[in-house]
Amino acid sequence: MKIGIYTLGCKVNQYETQAMEQELTASGHELVDFESPADAYIINTCSVTAVSDKKSRQMIRRAKKNSPDAVVAACGCYVQTHEEEAKSLGIDLLMGTNDRARFLDRLEEAVKTRETVADIDDALRRRTFEVLPAGGMANRTRAMLKVEDGCVNFCTYCIIPYARGPVRSLPMDKAAEQVRALRSQGYRELVVTGIEISSYGHDLKDGTTLIDLLEIIAREGGEMRIRLGSLEPRTVTREFCERAKKLPTLCPHFHLSMQSGCDATLKRMNRKYDTARYYESVELLREYFDDPAVTTDLITGFPEETEEEFGETLAFIEKCGFAAMHIFPYSVRPGTKAAAMAQVDMSVREERAARAAAVAERMHQGYLARCVGKTFPVLFEQDRGEGSVGHAPNYMPVTVDVKGLHNTVQNVRITAVDGDGLRGEPEET
């Protein structure tokens, strides 16, 4: 079959799509562009915000429009949390956020019977980590290693615990095995991902933590760079930093989840830290690493957020001096505690997001400017025009005027800020 795939959402979704792609191609199916005619389409959906829900529905409808006779399959968080709504869209195969290994069987069943197949479990009852094969598509330089699934934080705004279930961790021996496989396939960088990787090991009940896993990954990965997914502030302790500093392949890019810079707002969100603890994590990272890229997420206009509270957040993000930020106006998720709170008008949420974005852009440009004159080992991912584009260890994009550097690491001296990235010159080897 010719199959088109579209993925929305986080790196976990990207990883799970990658696993499905491997299974499909290994079984003789052909992957085609999502906009091309196909026998089947797969949409890996997201439900982190209302916009994500809307995009998921749009892509399902687009698939049906692209090839009216094709089988349309959908999986992921939107399907898991909105099963009945998803069924109303006329999807042929509905699977949630589990049993990726059985996806091909279910897809072939839907193609054969032309009847709707629904296979969605109760996420909150899951207790076992689903191990998927390591690897990816041949033209990619960066592989993802999913080490954890699920979340038990139950932030008042978030639906994801209901979509993904409780914490389940990839056993360390399986992680080591997958890292060796990815290394042998020639990947240059490994992204350690999960729904909430700070909780890695929580379910193993043997004292294992994320830093233990990272040491195993570094040992088995050789020269493969290690990049971390989003971290909770509680992870960043002095012990964590002391041990992480000793891992030569760990990229100094730390996405430290924040959401608000106001203690009262954080409490309403049911976040498990205050601004003092958060800032302690930022300072520890800067103590142990040379000008690391500390990045974050921010929700503006959370229920009951006053102008004074938002002002505290603006002052706090200035204090932290982030290298980059992802900023979202608060999105109501039905069924969450925050949905029942007093809502801030959407125009105010968006206006605050714009104000925060202006501060974030100034800080981002300042961080880029500090990179000028430095030399970074850049992993190049693609040609662009007459040059090549890649990322420095701090995840800043770097462009050079040399083609043909795909999947190589080159030392590059940064000569200028280039929009939202950097420009440089490869050093002579």
Give the positions of each predicted feature:
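Radical SAM/AdoMet-radical enzyme domain recognition
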Residues: 184, 211-212, 216-225, 237-296
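Short, surface-exposed connector motifs at secondary-structure boundaries
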Residues: 2, 67-68, 220-227
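Flexible glycine/acidic-rich beta-alpha junction loops that bind and position SAM and/or redox cofactors
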Residues: 83, 194-203, 235-239, 258-269, ...
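Short flexible coil/turn linkers enriched for glycine and charged/polar residues
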Residues: 138-141, 151-152, 250, 260, ...
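Short catalytic-loop micro-motif centered on adjacent basic/acidic residues
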Residues: 73-74, 226-229
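Conserved, mostly hydrophobic/aromatic
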Residues: 175, 192, 228, 256, ...
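Terminal RNA-binding accessory module
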Residues: 340-429
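Proteins enriched for Cys/Gly/acidic motifs involved in redox and nucleic-acid/cofactor modification
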Residues: 1-200, 209, 239, 250, ...
